[in-house]
Amino acid sequence: MTLRLSRRAYAEMFGPTTGDRIRLADTELLIEVERDHTLYGEEVKFGGGKVIRDGMGQSQLPAADVADTVITNAVILDHWGIVKADIAIKHGRIAAIGKAGNPDIQPGVTIAIGAATEIIAGEGLIVTAGGIDTHIHFISPQQIDEALASGVTTMIGGGTGPATGTNATTCTPGPWHMERMLQAADGWPINLGFLGKGNASRPQPLVEQIEAGAIGLKLHEDWGTTPAAIDNCLTVADDTDTQVAIHTDTLNEAGFVEATVAAFKGRTIHTYHTEGAGGGHAPDILKVCGEANVLPSSTNPTRPYTINTLDEHLDMLMVCHHLDPSIAEDLAFAESRIRRETIAAEDILHDLGALSMLSSDSQAMGRVGEVIIRTWQTAHKMKVQRGALTGDGARNDNFRAKRYVAKYTINPALTHGIAHEVGSIEPGKWADLVLWEPAFFGVKPAMIVKGGMIAVAQMGDPNASIPTPQPVHYREMFATRGGALARTSLTFVSQLALDAGISARYGLAKRLVPVRGCRTVTKRDMIHNAWQPAIRVDPETYDVVADGALLTCEPAAVLPMAQRYFLF
Protein backbone atom coordinates (compact mmCIF):
# COMPACT_ATOMS: atom_id res chain seq x y z
CA MET A 1 0.00 0.00 0.00
CA THR A 2 1.31 3.44 -0.90
CA LEU A 3 0.42 6.80 0.56
CA ARG A 4 0.50 9.90 -1.59
CA LEU A 5 1.60 13.12 0.11
CA SER A 6 1.37 16.63 -1.21
CA ARG A 7 4.70 18.38 -1.69
CA ARG A 8 3.87 20.66 1.22
CA ALA A 9 3.06 17.77 3.54
CA TYR A 10 6.19 15.89 2.48
CA ALA A 11 8.42 18.93 2.98
CA GLU A 12 6.95 19.59 6.40
CA MET A 13 7.61 15.99 7.43
CA PHE A 14 10.91 15.12 5.73
CA GLY A 15 12.19 18.41 4.32
CA PRO A 16 12.28 19.59 0.69
CA THR A 17 12.89 17.08 -2.10
CA THR A 18 13.90 17.21 -5.77
CA GLY A 19 12.29 20.17 -7.52
CA ASP A 20 11.38 22.02 -4.35
CA ARG A 21 12.71 25.54 -4.01
CA ILE A 22 13.98 27.31 -0.91
CA ARG A 23 14.31 31.03 -0.35
CA LEU A 24 17.56 32.01 1.36
CA ALA A 25 16.68 34.23 4.32
CA ASP A 26 14.75 37.30 3.13
CA THR A 27 16.73 37.65 -0.09
CA GLU A 28 15.54 37.26 -3.67
CA LEU A 29 17.74 34.15 -3.99
CA LEU A 30 16.06 30.79 -4.55
CA ILE A 31 17.82 27.43 -4.58
CA GLU A 32 16.25 24.27 -5.98
CA VAL A 33 17.01 20.74 -4.81
CA GLU A 34 18.74 18.99 -7.71
CA ARG A 35 18.70 15.44 -6.37
CA ASP A 36 17.35 13.49 -3.40
CA HIS A 37 19.55 10.65 -2.13
CA THR A 38 16.85 9.38 0.21
CA LEU A 39 14.18 6.92 -0.97
CA TYR A 40 10.52 7.83 -0.79
CA GLY A 41 8.85 5.69 1.83
CA GLU A 42 12.20 4.66 3.33
CA GLU A 43 13.24 7.98 4.88
CA VAL A 44 14.67 7.83 8.37
CA LYS A 45 13.52 10.19 11.08
CA PHE A 46 14.01 10.13 14.83
CA GLY A 47 11.30 10.56 17.45
CA GLY A 48 8.43 8.87 19.22
CA GLY A 49 6.61 6.55 16.83
CA LYS A 50 9.08 7.28 14.07
CA VAL A 51 11.60 5.28 12.04
CA ILE A 52 14.94 5.20 13.85
CA ARG A 53 14.09 2.52 16.40
CA ASP A 54 15.62 -0.84 17.19
CA GLY A 55 14.80 -3.36 14.48
CA MET A 56 13.31 -0.67 12.26
CA GLY A 57 15.58 2.13 11.01
CA GLN A 58 18.26 1.15 13.52
CA SER A 59 20.31 -1.96 12.83
CA GLN A 60 22.10 -4.45 15.08
CA LEU A 61 25.51 -3.62 13.64
CA PRO A 62 28.39 -2.81 16.01
CA ALA A 63 29.96 0.64 16.39
CA ALA A 64 32.70 -0.11 13.87
CA ASP A 65 30.13 -0.59 11.10
CA VAL A 66 27.78 2.34 11.75
CA ALA A 67 28.00 6.11 11.74
CA ASP A 68 28.82 7.98 14.93
CA THR A 69 26.37 10.71 13.93
CA VAL A 70 23.82 11.03 11.12
CA ILE A 71 22.28 14.32 10.05
CA THR A 72 18.99 13.19 8.54
CA ASN A 73 17.18 14.57 5.48
CA ALA A 74 19.28 17.71 5.14
CA VAL A 75 19.61 19.95 2.09
CA ILE A 76 23.31 20.34 1.31
CA LEU A 77 24.41 23.57 -0.37
CA ASP A 78 27.99 23.29 -1.61
CA HIS A 79 30.05 24.23 -4.64
CA TRP A 80 29.42 20.79 -6.18
CA GLY A 81 25.65 20.74 -5.89
CA ILE A 82 22.41 21.30 -4.01
CA VAL A 83 21.10 17.94 -2.85
CA LYS A 84 18.92 16.32 -0.22
CA ALA A 85 20.70 13.57 1.71
CA ASP A 86 21.61 12.00 5.00
CA ILE A 87 25.14 12.89 6.16
CA ALA A 88 27.24 10.38 8.08
CA ILE A 89 30.02 11.43 10.45
CA LYS A 90 32.62 8.95 11.70
CA HIS A 91 35.67 9.67 13.85
CA GLY A 92 35.22 13.40 13.35
CA ARG A 93 35.10 13.22 9.56
CA ILE A 94 32.38 13.16 6.93
CA ALA A 95 32.02 9.46 6.18
CA ALA A 96 29.28 9.42 3.55
CA ILE A 97 26.52 11.39 1.85
CA GLY A 98 23.60 9.20 0.94
CA LYS A 99 20.73 7.16 2.38
CA ALA A 100 20.81 6.20 6.06
CA GLY A 101 18.95 3.40 7.75
CA ASN A 102 18.97 -0.31 8.56
CA PRO A 103 20.53 -2.34 5.71
CA ASP A 104 18.94 -5.53 7.08
CA ILE A 105 15.43 -4.44 6.18
CA GLN A 106 15.67 -1.29 4.04
CA PRO A 107 16.73 -0.98 0.39
CA GLY A 108 19.39 1.41 -0.88
CA VAL A 109 21.05 2.03 2.49
CA THR A 110 24.57 3.47 2.16
CA ILE A 111 24.84 4.67 5.77
CA ALA A 112 24.11 2.21 8.56
CA ILE A 113 22.52 3.40 11.78
CA GLY A 114 23.11 1.43 14.97
CA ALA A 115 23.02 1.69 18.73
CA ALA A 116 26.26 3.69 18.53
CA THR A 117 24.70 6.37 16.30
CA GLU A 118 23.57 9.82 17.41
CA ILE A 119 20.98 11.66 15.30
CA ILE A 120 20.80 15.34 14.39
CA ALA A 121 17.48 16.16 12.72
CA GLY A 122 18.22 17.95 9.47
CA GLU A 123 14.64 18.00 8.17
CA GLY A 124 13.95 21.45 6.78
CA LEU A 125 17.52 22.63 7.35
CA ILE A 126 20.29 23.68 4.97
CA VAL A 127 23.80 22.41 5.66
CA THR A 128 26.91 24.18 4.41
CA ALA A 129 30.60 23.60 4.98
CA GLY A 130 32.16 25.66 7.74
CA GLY A 131 33.33 29.02 6.48
CA ILE A 132 37.01 29.89 6.04
CA ASP A 133 38.15 33.46 6.74
CA THR A 134 41.64 34.05 5.36
CA HIS A 135 42.09 37.70 6.35
CA ILE A 136 42.23 37.73 10.13
CA HIS A 137 43.98 40.30 12.28
CA PHE A 138 44.33 38.41 15.56
CA ILE A 139 43.73 41.55 17.61
CA SER A 140 41.40 40.05 20.20
CA PRO A 141 40.71 36.37 20.91
CA GLN A 142 37.02 37.18 21.33
CA GLN A 143 36.86 37.43 17.53
CA ILE A 144 36.84 33.64 17.54
CA ASP A 145 33.55 33.50 19.44
CA GLU A 146 31.95 35.89 16.96
CA ALA A 147 33.32 34.08 13.93
CA LEU A 148 32.30 30.63 15.13
CA ALA A 149 28.77 31.76 15.93
CA SER A 150 28.47 33.18 12.40
CA GLY A 151 29.39 29.87 10.76
CA VAL A 152 33.13 30.36 10.26
CA THR A 153 35.12 27.35 11.46
CA THR A 154 38.61 28.16 10.12
CA MET A 155 40.56 31.40 10.60
CA ILE A 156 43.81 32.25 8.81
CA GLY A 157 45.83 35.40 9.36
CA GLY A 158 48.34 36.86 11.74
CA GLY A 159 48.90 38.98 14.78
CA THR A 160 49.77 38.94 18.45
CA GLY A 161 46.90 40.87 20.07
CA PRO A 162 46.17 44.61 20.04
CA ALA A 163 49.72 45.61 19.15
CA THR A 164 50.03 48.51 16.74
CA GLY A 165 51.49 46.24 14.07
CA THR A 166 48.64 43.74 14.38
CA ASN A 167 46.01 46.49 14.28
CA ALA A 168 47.21 47.23 10.75
CA THR A 169 48.75 44.01 9.40
CA THR A 170 47.99 40.28 9.52
CA CYS A 171 51.47 39.15 10.54
CA THR A 172 52.68 37.01 13.43
CA PRO A 173 56.33 38.07 13.29
CA GLY A 174 59.21 35.80 14.21
CA PRO A 175 59.59 32.39 15.89
CA TRP A 176 58.88 33.57 19.45
CA HIS A 177 55.51 35.12 18.58
CA MET A 178 54.67 32.16 16.34
CA GLU A 179 55.26 29.69 19.18
CA ARG A 180 53.12 31.72 21.58
CA MET A 181 50.23 32.01 19.11
CA LEU A 182 50.32 28.30 18.31
CA GLN A 183 50.14 27.59 22.03
CA ALA A 184 47.21 30.00 22.35
CA ALA A 185 45.47 28.19 19.48
CA ASP A 186 45.09 25.15 21.73
CA GLY A 187 42.52 27.05 23.78
CA TRP A 188 40.02 27.84 21.03
CA PRO A 189 37.46 25.54 19.34
CA ILE A 190 38.26 26.62 15.80
CA ASN A 191 40.80 25.69 13.13
CA LEU A 192 43.66 28.18 13.01
CA GLY A 193 46.63 28.96 10.79
CA PHE A 194 49.11 31.81 11.17
CA LEU A 195 50.97 33.93 8.62
CA GLY A 196 54.47 35.20 9.34
CA LYS A 197 55.80 38.59 8.32
CA GLY A 198 57.00 38.37 4.72
CA ASN A 199 58.65 41.78 4.40
CA ALA A 200 62.36 41.07 4.18
CA SER A 201 64.89 41.11 1.35
CA ARG A 202 66.86 38.07 2.51
CA PRO A 203 65.54 34.52 2.99
CA GLN A 204 66.65 33.64 6.54
CA PRO A 205 64.19 35.85 8.49
CA LEU A 206 61.36 34.29 6.48
CA VAL A 207 62.48 30.67 6.51
CA GLU A 208 62.78 30.68 10.30
CA GLN A 209 59.13 31.75 10.58
CA ILE A 210 58.02 28.89 8.34
CA GLU A 211 60.11 26.48 10.42
CA ALA A 212 58.44 27.88 13.54
CA GLY A 213 54.98 26.95 12.25
CA ALA A 214 53.73 29.65 9.87
CA ILE A 215 51.51 28.32 7.07
CA GLY A 216 52.56 31.20 4.85
CA LEU A 217 53.84 34.74 4.76
CA LYS A 218 52.13 38.11 4.57
CA LEU A 219 53.52 41.06 2.65
CA HIS A 220 52.01 44.36 3.79
CA GLU A 221 52.65 47.85 2.51
CA ASP A 222 52.91 49.16 6.08
CA TRP A 223 56.07 47.05 6.44
CA GLY A 224 57.35 47.96 2.95
CA THR A 225 56.06 45.82 0.09
CA THR A 226 58.84 46.53 -2.39
CA PRO A 227 59.62 44.45 -5.49
CA ALA A 228 62.69 43.07 -3.71
CA ALA A 229 60.63 41.95 -0.71
CA ILE A 230 57.99 40.42 -2.98
CA ASP A 231 60.56 38.46 -4.97
CA ASN A 232 62.35 37.19 -1.87
CA CYS A 233 59.11 36.20 -0.15
CA LEU A 234 57.82 34.25 -3.14
CA THR A 235 61.16 32.49 -3.50
CA VAL A 236 60.94 31.28 0.11
CA ALA A 237 57.32 30.24 -0.42
CA ASP A 238 58.26 28.19 -3.49
CA ASP A 239 60.96 26.44 -1.49
CA THR A 240 58.63 25.61 1.44
CA ASP A 241 55.26 24.99 -0.31
CA THR A 242 53.53 27.79 1.57
CA GLN A 243 51.28 30.61 0.41
CA VAL A 244 52.01 34.33 0.23
CA ALA A 245 49.31 36.91 0.89
CA ILE A 246 49.96 40.48 -0.16
CA HIS A 247 48.58 43.93 0.61
CA THR A 248 50.14 46.00 -2.14
CA ASP A 249 51.56 49.50 -2.27
CA THR A 250 48.69 52.02 -2.10
CA LEU A 251 50.99 55.01 -2.56
CA ASN A 252 52.79 53.44 -5.52
CA GLU A 253 56.05 54.42 -3.83
CA ALA A 254 58.12 51.44 -4.98
CA GLY A 255 56.34 51.07 -8.30
CA PHE A 256 52.91 50.86 -9.86
CA VAL A 257 50.75 47.77 -10.12
CA GLU A 258 52.71 46.67 -13.19
CA ALA A 259 55.93 46.60 -11.14
CA THR A 260 54.28 44.44 -8.50
CA VAL A 261 52.94 42.00 -11.09
CA ALA A 262 56.40 41.85 -12.65
CA ALA A 263 57.88 41.00 -9.25
CA PHE A 264 55.48 38.06 -8.98
CA LYS A 265 57.27 36.51 -11.99
CA GLY A 266 54.25 34.32 -12.68
CA ARG A 267 54.33 32.78 -9.21
CA THR A 268 51.16 32.03 -7.25
CA ILE A 269 50.08 34.69 -4.77
CA HIS A 270 46.93 35.53 -2.80
CA THR A 271 46.17 39.22 -3.31
CA TYR A 272 44.31 40.68 -0.36
CA HIS A 273 42.20 43.79 -0.91
CA THR A 274 41.65 43.21 -4.61
CA GLU A 275 38.82 45.67 -4.25
CA GLY A 276 37.52 49.17 -4.44
CA ALA A 277 38.59 50.70 -1.13
CA GLY A 278 40.61 48.37 1.07
CA GLY A 279 44.09 49.34 -0.01
CA GLY A 280 46.71 48.34 -2.49
CA HIS A 281 47.80 50.10 -5.67
CA ALA A 282 45.52 53.11 -6.16
CA PRO A 283 43.42 53.24 -8.18
CA ASP A 284 43.95 50.10 -10.25
CA ILE A 285 44.71 47.11 -7.99
CA LEU A 286 41.65 45.45 -9.56
CA LYS A 287 43.75 44.84 -12.68
CA VAL A 288 45.43 41.84 -11.03
CA CYS A 289 42.15 39.88 -11.37
CA GLY A 290 43.21 39.12 -14.91
CA GLU A 291 46.48 37.41 -13.96
CA ALA A 292 46.57 33.60 -14.11
CA ASN A 293 48.83 33.31 -11.06
CA VAL A 294 46.86 35.72 -8.87
CA LEU A 295 44.24 34.40 -6.43
CA PRO A 296 42.20 37.52 -5.62
CA SER A 297 40.07 38.18 -2.56
CA SER A 298 38.26 41.20 -1.21
CA THR A 299 37.06 42.04 2.28
CA ASN A 300 33.62 42.60 3.70
CA PRO A 301 33.46 46.33 4.60
CA THR A 302 32.74 47.20 0.95
CA ARG A 303 30.33 44.28 0.54
CA PRO A 304 27.97 45.13 -0.99
CA TYR A 305 28.11 48.71 -2.25
CA THR A 306 25.49 50.74 -0.37
CA ILE A 307 24.58 54.38 0.22
CA ASN A 308 26.56 54.26 3.50
CA THR A 309 29.76 52.59 2.30
CA LEU A 310 31.81 55.69 1.49
CA ASP A 311 30.96 57.60 4.65
CA GLU A 312 31.93 54.70 6.87
CA HIS A 313 35.31 54.04 5.32
CA LEU A 314 37.30 57.20 5.99
CA ASP A 315 37.18 57.03 9.79
CA MET A 316 37.83 53.28 9.73
CA LEU A 317 40.90 53.76 7.62
CA MET A 318 42.39 56.50 9.79
CA VAL A 319 42.16 54.31 12.89
CA CYS A 320 43.30 51.04 11.37
CA HIS A 321 46.42 52.37 9.69
CA HIS A 322 47.57 54.67 12.47
CA LEU A 323 46.96 57.82 10.45
CA ASP A 324 46.59 61.38 11.73
CA PRO A 325 43.76 63.44 10.18
CA SER A 326 45.71 66.62 10.97
CA ILE A 327 48.50 65.56 8.60
CA ALA A 328 47.64 66.36 4.99
CA GLU A 329 49.64 63.46 3.60
CA ASP A 330 47.84 60.97 5.87
CA LEU A 331 44.47 62.34 4.81
CA ALA A 332 45.42 62.12 1.13
CA PHE A 333 46.57 58.53 1.67
CA ALA A 334 43.19 57.64 3.16
CA GLU A 335 41.14 59.41 0.51
CA SER A 336 43.09 57.75 -2.31
CA ARG A 337 41.83 54.36 -1.14
CA ILE A 338 38.10 55.14 -1.12
CA ARG A 339 36.61 55.28 -4.63
CA ARG A 340 32.92 54.78 -5.38
CA GLU A 341 33.56 53.63 -8.96
CA THR A 342 35.90 50.80 -7.99
CA ILE A 343 33.66 49.74 -5.09
CA ALA A 344 30.72 49.46 -7.50
CA ALA A 345 32.84 47.45 -9.92
CA GLU A 346 33.84 45.13 -7.09
CA ASP A 347 30.20 44.02 -6.75
CA ILE A 348 30.07 43.03 -10.41
CA LEU A 349 33.49 41.36 -10.43
CA HIS A 350 32.32 39.15 -7.58
CA ASP A 351 29.13 38.32 -9.45
CA LEU A 352 31.00 37.37 -12.62
CA GLY A 353 33.54 35.25 -10.77
CA ALA A 354 36.61 37.44 -11.28
CA LEU A 355 37.04 37.92 -7.53
CA SER A 356 37.45 34.43 -6.11
CA MET A 357 37.23 34.84 -2.34
CA LEU A 358 35.68 37.01 0.36
CA SER A 359 37.05 37.53 3.86
CA SER A 360 36.69 39.87 6.83
CA ASP A 361 39.79 41.97 7.65
CA SER A 362 38.70 41.54 11.26
CA GLN A 363 38.78 44.65 13.46
CA ALA A 364 41.02 46.27 10.86
CA MET A 365 38.23 47.71 8.70
CA GLY A 366 36.20 44.50 8.51
CA ARG A 367 33.69 42.65 10.68
CA VAL A 368 34.66 39.12 11.64
CA GLY A 369 31.09 37.94 12.15
CA GLU A 370 29.74 39.22 8.83
CA VAL A 371 31.69 37.38 6.13
CA ILE A 372 28.78 35.06 5.37
CA ILE A 373 26.06 37.70 5.71
CA ARG A 374 27.79 40.12 3.36
CA THR A 375 28.58 37.43 0.82
CA TRP A 376 24.90 36.64 0.42
CA GLN A 377 23.86 40.30 0.58
CA THR A 378 26.15 40.88 -2.40
CA ALA A 379 24.61 37.93 -4.23
CA HIS A 380 21.12 39.30 -3.57
CA LYS A 381 22.03 42.83 -4.70
CA MET A 382 23.52 41.50 -7.92
CA LYS A 383 20.48 39.38 -8.70
CA VAL A 384 18.18 42.34 -8.16
CA GLN A 385 20.34 44.70 -10.23
CA ARG A 386 21.71 42.35 -12.89
CA GLY A 387 19.22 39.49 -13.15
CA ALA A 388 19.97 35.80 -13.55
CA LEU A 389 23.48 34.59 -14.25
CA THR A 390 24.24 32.47 -17.28
CA GLY A 391 23.46 28.96 -16.12
CA ASP A 392 20.51 30.01 -13.98
CA GLY A 393 16.95 30.19 -15.21
CA ALA A 394 13.69 31.64 -14.02
CA ARG A 395 13.16 28.92 -11.41
CA ASN A 396 16.33 29.09 -9.34
CA ASP A 397 19.66 30.74 -8.59
CA ASN A 398 21.60 27.53 -8.11
CA PHE A 399 24.69 28.55 -10.05
CA ARG A 400 24.88 31.92 -8.34
CA ALA A 401 24.51 30.21 -4.95
CA LYS A 402 27.33 27.77 -5.76
CA ARG A 403 29.54 30.63 -6.94
CA TYR A 404 29.04 32.64 -3.78
CA VAL A 405 29.31 29.77 -1.29
CA ALA A 406 32.63 28.83 -2.92
CA LYS A 407 34.03 32.28 -2.10
CA TYR A 408 34.21 31.53 1.63
CA THR A 409 34.59 27.73 1.63
CA ILE A 410 36.43 25.76 -1.04
CA ASN A 411 38.40 28.55 -2.74
CA PRO A 412 40.10 29.84 0.44
CA ALA A 413 40.86 26.20 1.29
CA LEU A 414 42.47 25.60 -2.10
CA THR A 415 44.42 28.84 -1.89
CA HIS A 416 46.00 28.07 1.46
CA GLY A 417 46.61 24.37 0.96
CA ILE A 418 43.99 23.04 3.37
CA ALA A 419 41.36 21.73 0.93
CA HIS A 420 42.35 18.15 1.72
CA GLU A 421 40.85 18.73 5.19
CA VAL A 422 38.19 21.45 5.01
CA GLY A 423 36.27 23.68 2.62
CA SER A 424 33.51 21.41 1.34
CA ILE A 425 31.08 18.68 2.34
CA GLU A 426 32.77 15.60 0.93
CA PRO A 427 33.59 12.16 2.35
CA GLY A 428 36.94 12.08 4.11
CA LYS A 429 36.98 15.73 5.10
CA TRP A 430 36.87 17.10 8.63
CA ALA A 431 33.24 17.35 9.74
CA ASP A 432 32.96 21.13 10.11
CA LEU A 433 29.32 21.73 9.25
CA VAL A 434 26.88 24.60 9.69
CA LEU A 435 23.13 23.97 9.97
CA TRP A 436 20.72 26.75 9.03
CA GLU A 437 16.98 27.27 9.14
CA PRO A 438 16.21 28.69 5.67
CA ALA A 439 14.59 31.82 7.12
CA PHE A 440 17.82 32.57 8.98
CA PHE A 441 20.23 31.34 6.32
CA GLY A 442 23.51 33.23 6.26
CA VAL A 443 22.53 35.26 9.31
CA LYS A 444 22.10 33.07 12.37
CA PRO A 445 23.08 29.39 12.24
CA ALA A 446 21.01 26.90 14.19
CA MET A 447 24.05 24.80 15.04
CA ILE A 448 27.77 24.58 14.30
CA VAL A 449 29.41 21.14 14.24
CA LYS A 450 33.21 21.04 14.69
CA GLY A 451 35.08 17.87 13.94
CA GLY A 452 31.90 15.84 14.26
CA MET A 453 30.79 17.29 17.61
CA ILE A 454 28.38 20.14 18.33
CA ALA A 455 30.44 23.21 19.24
CA VAL A 456 27.91 26.06 19.28
CA ALA A 457 24.12 26.06 19.13
CA GLN A 458 21.14 28.25 19.81
CA MET A 459 20.11 27.10 23.26
CA GLY A 460 17.43 28.17 25.69
CA ASP A 461 17.45 28.58 29.45
CA PRO A 462 19.63 25.79 30.92
CA ASN A 463 17.31 25.64 33.96
CA ALA A 464 14.21 25.13 31.84
CA SER A 465 12.36 21.82 31.55
CA ILE A 466 12.98 21.70 27.78
CA PRO A 467 15.75 23.19 25.57
CA THR A 468 13.68 25.94 23.92
CA PRO A 469 12.46 28.50 26.53
CA GLN A 470 13.83 32.02 26.37
CA PRO A 471 16.36 33.45 26.54
CA VAL A 472 17.57 31.55 23.47
CA HIS A 473 21.04 32.58 22.34
CA TYR A 474 24.31 31.10 21.21
CA ARG A 475 25.99 28.97 23.82
CA GLU A 476 29.14 26.89 23.61
CA MET A 477 28.56 23.16 23.67
CA PHE A 478 30.65 20.17 24.72
CA ALA A 479 33.07 20.29 21.76
CA THR A 480 34.49 23.45 23.32
CA ARG A 481 35.28 21.87 26.68
CA GLY A 482 38.10 19.81 28.14
CA GLY A 483 40.04 17.43 25.98
CA ALA A 484 37.30 17.42 23.32
CA LEU A 485 38.40 20.87 22.16
CA ALA A 486 41.80 19.66 20.96
CA ARG A 487 40.26 16.64 19.24
CA THR A 488 37.61 18.51 17.27
CA SER A 489 39.69 21.39 15.89
CA LEU A 490 42.88 21.56 13.84
CA THR A 491 45.93 23.78 13.74
CA PHE A 492 47.48 24.21 10.30
CA VAL A 493 51.27 24.51 10.00
CA SER A 494 53.95 24.12 7.36
CA GLN A 495 55.37 20.70 6.51
CA LEU A 496 58.76 22.12 7.50
CA ALA A 497 57.49 22.87 11.01
CA LEU A 498 55.80 19.51 11.38
CA ASP A 499 58.99 17.72 10.38
CA ALA A 500 60.89 19.84 12.92
CA GLY A 501 58.74 18.42 15.72
CA ILE A 502 57.14 21.65 16.93
CA SER A 503 54.16 19.80 18.42
CA ALA A 504 56.26 18.19 21.14
CA ARG A 505 58.66 21.12 21.43
CA TYR A 506 55.87 23.64 21.99
CA GLY A 507 53.74 21.24 24.06
CA LEU A 508 50.73 21.48 21.72
CA ALA A 509 47.54 19.50 22.25
CA LYS A 510 45.73 20.06 18.96
CA ARG A 511 46.43 17.94 15.93
CA LEU A 512 48.82 19.70 13.55
CA VAL A 513 48.01 19.41 9.85
CA PRO A 514 50.51 20.52 7.19
CA VAL A 515 49.40 22.71 4.30
CA ARG A 516 50.14 21.39 0.82
CA GLY A 517 49.82 22.29 -2.84
CA CYS A 518 50.05 26.03 -2.19
CA ARG A 519 52.45 26.73 -5.05
CA THR A 520 50.62 24.92 -7.84
CA VAL A 521 47.14 26.39 -7.43
CA THR A 522 46.17 28.99 -10.05
CA LYS A 523 43.20 31.20 -10.88
CA ARG A 524 41.89 28.36 -13.07
CA ASP A 525 41.47 26.29 -9.91
CA MET A 526 39.16 28.81 -8.25
CA ILE A 527 35.86 26.95 -8.44
CA HIS A 528 33.06 28.96 -10.12
CA ASN A 529 35.29 32.05 -9.70
CA ALA A 530 38.01 31.70 -12.33
CA TRP A 531 37.26 34.52 -14.80
CA GLN A 532 40.40 36.42 -15.88
CA PRO A 533 39.24 39.64 -17.55
CA ALA A 534 41.49 42.32 -18.97
CA ILE A 535 40.76 45.22 -16.62
CA ARG A 536 41.49 48.90 -17.13
CA VAL A 537 40.87 51.57 -14.48
CA ASP A 538 40.75 55.17 -15.69
CA PRO A 539 43.25 57.15 -13.56
CA GLU A 540 41.10 60.29 -13.72
CA THR A 541 37.53 59.03 -13.39
CA TYR A 542 38.25 55.62 -11.77
CA ASP A 543 35.83 53.98 -14.21
CA VAL A 544 36.46 50.24 -14.43
CA VAL A 545 36.31 48.44 -17.79
CA ALA A 546 36.60 44.64 -17.99
CA ASP A 547 36.98 42.98 -21.40
CA GLY A 548 35.65 46.17 -22.95
CA ALA A 549 32.55 46.50 -20.76
CA LEU A 550 32.06 49.32 -18.24
CA LEU A 551 31.36 47.90 -14.78
CA THR A 552 29.05 50.09 -12.75
CA CYS A 553 26.03 49.72 -10.50
CA GLU A 554 23.96 51.76 -8.10
CA PRO A 555 24.45 51.62 -4.33
CA ALA A 556 21.81 49.70 -2.43
CA ALA A 557 19.52 51.74 -0.17
CA VAL A 558 18.02 48.68 1.54
CA LEU A 559 19.49 45.23 2.13
CA PRO A 560 18.11 41.88 3.25
CA MET A 561 19.66 39.92 6.13
CA ALA A 562 19.90 43.15 8.09
CA GLN A 563 17.93 44.95 10.82
CA ARG A 564 14.93 42.63 10.98
CA TYR A 565 17.25 39.84 12.13
CA PHE A 566 18.87 41.86 14.91
CA LEU A 567 16.01 43.32 16.91
CA PHE A 568 17.05 41.41 20.03
From Swiss-Prot:
Catalytic positions?
H321
Q: In which pathway does it act?
A: Nitrogen metabolism; urea degradation; CO(2) and NH(3) from urea (urease route): step 1/1
Which cofactor does the UniProt annotation name? Ni cation
Q: Which residues bind substrate?
A: H220
Q: What is its EC number?
A: 3.5.1.5
Task: Give binding positions for Ni(2+) 2.
Answer: K218, H247, H273
Question: Which InterPro entries would you find in this protein's record?
Answer: Amidohydro-rel, Metal-dep_hydrolase_composite, Metal_Hydrolase, Urease_alpha_N_dom, Urease_alpha_subunit, Urease_AS, Urease_asu, Urease_asu_c
What sections of the sequence does the record tag as coiled-coil? none
Cofactor binding mode and count: Binds 2 nickel ions per subunit.
**Where is each Urease domain found?**
130-568
Q: Where does Ni(2+) 1 bind?
A: H135, H137, K218, D361
Biological processes, Gene Ontology terms: urea catabolic process
Q: Spell out the PANTHER family in the cross-references.
A: UREASE
Name the UniProt record assigns to this protein: Urease subunit alpha
Q: Cite the source lineage.
A: Bacteria, Pseudomonadati, Pseudomonadota, Betaproteobacteria, Burkholderiales
As recorded in Swiss-Prot or TrEMBL, the protein's gene is named ureC
